[in-house]
Amino acid sequence: MAHRGGERDFQTSARRMGTSLLFQLSVHERELDLVFLDHSYAKPWSAHPDASSARPTRMLFVTPRRQQENTIESDVPIDVETVTATPVPLYDNQKARSVMNECERHVIFARTDADAPPPPEDWEEHVNRTGWTVAQNKLFNKILKALQSDRLARLANEGACNEPVLRRVAVDKCARRVRQALASVSWDTKLTQWLHTTLVETLSLPMLAAYLDALQTLKGKIPTLIDRMLVSSNTKTGAAGAEALSLLLKRPWDPAVGVLSHNKPSKLPGSPLILIVSSGPSSSVFPASRRHRFWQSQLSCLGKVIPVATHLLNNGSGVGVLQCLEHMIGAVRSKVLEIHSHFPHKPIILIGWNTGALVACHVSVMEYVTAVVCLGFPLLTVDGPRGDVDDPLLDMKTPVLFVIGQNSLQCHPEAMEDFREKIRAENSLVVVGGADDNLRISKAKKKSEGLTQSMVDRCIQDEIVDFLTGVLTRAEGHVGSEPRDQDAEKKKKPRDLTRRDLAFEIPERGSRPASPAARLPTSPSGSEDLSSVSSSPTSSPKTKVTTVTSTQKSSQIGTSQLLKRHVQRTEAVLTHRQAQAQFAAFLKQNMLVRKAFPPGTSSCLFVPISSESVEDIEKEELRVQLKRHHSSSPLPGAKPSKRPKIKVSLISQGDTVGGPCTLSQGGTPEAAGGKPITMTLGASAGAKELTGLLTTAKSSSSEGGGTASTTPSVASSSATPNAIHTLQSRLVATSPGSSLPGTASASSLLQGLSFSLQDISSKTSGLPGSPSPGPAPQATSVKLPTPMQSLGAITTGTSTIVRTIPVATTLSSLGATPGGKPTAIHQLLTNGSLAKLASSLPGLAQISNQASGLKVPTTITLTLRGQPSRITTLSPMGSGATPSEEPNSQMLPSSSQRLPPAP
């Protein structure tokens, strides 16, 4: 079972990693995955709903801890016959030995061409030290001691299976000692040049090869000092010798040169842009190290590499640490914004070492990036470890990969695990065995594992590729689906806008910064304005959210054909929390308003409506509707006009100025004469649907001093009474407009009630020119001590639909100031504007001159304003009860008017 599980894990890892160097290096000691070794129904680590976003830790070259056996055998058998197989090295052994002996071949070639014989083996006894100073003797002895140690290491490692790796470790140790010796004399030019000339002339061939290996290693780290040291010898050896030595010292040899050249990192999907964040202010005096250049060349295989350099004025004189960090963060942010402006659809990856990793994390919190890679993340700070409540890095939403060393002093693996559990973003951790803060493995680790630093860096790069491939694949699939969804939304007509809640689409505070590709405009105008949001042809004038109950679904099909006009919403979109708070205030205020109504009155659903935009909406709708061609003749022979739309907006709260007028106060000359008017419409083909838009008014008797009776509704015989209760399904809430500072209302949300009545049309044979048969009800506004308003009856040919909507108003709510000065609203109520609108409505028989020739509008908007605190009585329809007076109420300045009856 264990063998099968191990083979299956091997095959799965081979398919996942392909031909990566990490797979080749760790194939000998790969830890088995417990999920694969378990039963087939085992679930991964992330299947639990409470699983954190921290992925399991990946270990690189970490020796597994094996438990020591407590039982010690007294007699241990020793096998002296079995031959142990030679382990296969992790690199090309033949090519590694070739580059290893490169300096020895150069020395033999140079000494053979020389005229002088080679130095003997006892060359130290033949060295003439006459005239040497104390500094020269000390320097020469230190260099000689380092070269002798290297010679002993070469002899000890000769013939070993991993001799190239052991030789590389010994050469690095010798180069470090030579550098320390030269630094002891402060790299004095005369001393260093004298030392180099003396060593080249007196050293034996093996010792000279070791010396050139040390110089080759130091040339990659401190090229300027080595070039200054070799100036005098180049003039003596000639141009050919100097060129050969320069080519030899160009780059240090590496046992894994063949593996690195044949195993290049694979290109990441999506062609990302890789930003390398510097760990500090850059300076031309200190160029990048050879290892950083190697990293940059390897990362260039993944995508486009853009180093972000930070330059300080006057070499940073007078600049504090905090200012320097702010300058570094600002430089990276500006580079990210610049790339977003030029390549909005390109993924951006931030990679940083040590302090640069911290800068990259802070930038990811401020700007949108696809992923962050932190190499050598410093978890310990001056104020203690990271991960406190106020740590801004805990709010990261960008996927992040942490790569730390097992022996790191600034970041312990266990402390890093605790920090990862607190991060909300998807994160992963790679622990490099035997590595320090800069991910450099120790010499003991190199010897035991047979590794070099370049091989370890290459394996870390494979882990980075594995992490970024998953992140970019998911991001590419998510971004790639957005244009397809947008195209589908554009091609098909949105059937129901009420399913879309705009409040939930607004990003909450502290969320991840939006992608610049997601912020690109999807409409030709350059931005997705509010008009495009609610552009559904079936949306109601103030559509935002609708909750349809099971009892309302029966009439949904019929009523969906009625609401075909759309009014552009001008209110600002609120956030989700503001919408919740205002909706709670709306419910509270609605209960207060309902308590003021007398029992028995029909329920009114209050819908927020912006008082500032009512007049603009009316003008816009009338302008659009008047452009359409309608027949203005009400004669039977004329063509039937299209279905008009009557919108009644009851503003039951707010003391605003500039709102629309009311029906009962909009008097005409006929109305001033005292003639009652009966609004008569022809028998509508959509009368059944119309009844679905009107709620049934419950009749009740007068109760108390502040109640009144309302006339019950008389429904048409062709209409279904059950459909009358479906008006609530068409009433939807919108964002409320801002109330004025002087308003007397308790909440700015409860500002009005909007009824959309549509599909009122005439028969196909035309509108009737004669009065309707039967007694026509009359809409009468009785002059009462308290201000009140009533909406008249609407008669449709053979049937009558009577709806009484009681709203009590005050003088201030109608636009008149307490001082008695008329305002714009008050003037609009008395100048007969509503009568002019009513005269052009088809089906209102004999309201005004039939031969006026005016175009028939398809929309009439009636808005009644009131203040809930003043509601005391309700106006009856027809002849009825006289409500009681309220002492504190104010009288309207205009006298009550009666609409003339139909002839």
Swiss-Prot record:
Comp. bias (Basic and acidic residues): 478-511
Protein keywords: Chromatin regulator, Cytoplasm, Cytoskeleton, Microtubule, Mitochondrion, Nucleus, Phosphoprotein
Principal place of residence: nucleus
Range of residues in the leader sequence: none
TM stretches of this protein: none
Gene3D superfamilies on file: alpha/beta hydrolase
Any one GO CC term of the record: spindle pole
Chain's role: Non-catalytic component of the NSL histone acetyltransferase complex, a multiprotein complex that mediates histone H4 acetylation at 'Lys-5'- and 'Lys-8' (H4K5ac and H4K8ac) at transcription start sites and promotes transcription initiation. The NSL complex also acts as a regulator of gene expression in mitochondria. Within the NSL complex, KANSL3 is required to promote KAT8 association with mitochondrial DNA. Required for transcription of intraciliary transport genes in both ciliated and non-ciliated cells.
Protein name: KAT8 regulatory NSL complex subunit 3
Upper classification of the organism: Eukaryota, Metazoa, Chordata, Craniata, Vertebrata
